[in-house]
């Protein structure tokens, strides 16, 4: 996984899929964020379903949006 400087990585679970490859994610601490799939996951056709555990990368500037960078098997 490529790591961005300053990005915050947290674990969560997918609550609901939304249009345009967006997902509502509930983080471990109870917060809900809106996240999209990273380019590499899209490129390799990794499917994300509701209730999947994922790693989300959040920007320190906007903690309500993120990028899904990993799906646990």
Swiss-Prot record:
Please state where this protein is localized: Cytoplasm
UniProtKB keywords: Cytoplasm, Initiation factor, Protein biosynthesis, RNA-binding, rRNA-binding
Task: Spell out the InterPro entries in the cross-references.
Answer: NA-bd_OB-fold, RNA-binding_domain_S1_IF1, TIF_IF1
Q: Which Pfam families match?
A: eIF-1a
Write out the coiled-coil annotation as residue ranges: none
Domain S1-like residue range list: 1-73
* A GO term from the CC aspect: cytosol
Whether Protein transport counts among this entry's keywords is no
Quote one Gene Ontology molecular function term. Answer: translation initiation factor activity
Principal place where this protein is found? Answer: cytoplasm
| Keyword Protein biosynthesis in annotation | yes
The entry assigns this protein to a family as follows: Belongs to the IF-1 family.
Q: What does this protein do?
A: One of the essential components for the initiation of protein synthesis. Stabilizes the binding of IF-2 and IF-3 on the 30S subunit to which N-formylmethionyl-tRNA(fMet) subsequently binds. Helps modulate mRNA selection, yielding the 30S pre-initiation complex (PIC). Upon addition of the 50S ribosomal subunit IF-1, IF-2 and IF-3 are released leaving the mature 70S translation initiation complex.
PANTHER family tied to this protein:
TRANSLATION INITIATION FACTOR IF-1, CHLOROPLASTIC
Description of how the protein assembles with itself and partners: Component of the 30S ribosomal translation pre-initiation complex which assembles on the 30S ribosome in the order IF-2 and IF-3, IF-1 and N-formylmethionyl-tRNA(fMet); mRNA recruitment can occur at any time during PIC assembly.
Q: HAMAP family from the entry?
A: IF_1 (MF_00075)
Name assigned to this protein: Translation initiation factor IF-1
The species this protein belongs to is Mycolicibacterium gilvum (strain PYR-GCK) (Mycobacterium gilvum (strain PYR-GCK))
Recorded name of the encoding gene: infA
């Amino acid at each position: 996984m490529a790591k961005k400087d300053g990005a915050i990585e947290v674990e969560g679970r997918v609550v609901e899929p939304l249009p345009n490859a967006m997902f509502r994610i509930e983080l471990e601490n109870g917060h809900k964020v809106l996240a999209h799939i990273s380019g590499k996951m899209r490129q390799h056709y990794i499917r994300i379903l509701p209730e999947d555990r994922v790693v989300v990368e959040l920007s320190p500037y906007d903690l309500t949006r993120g990028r899904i960078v990993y799906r646990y098997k």
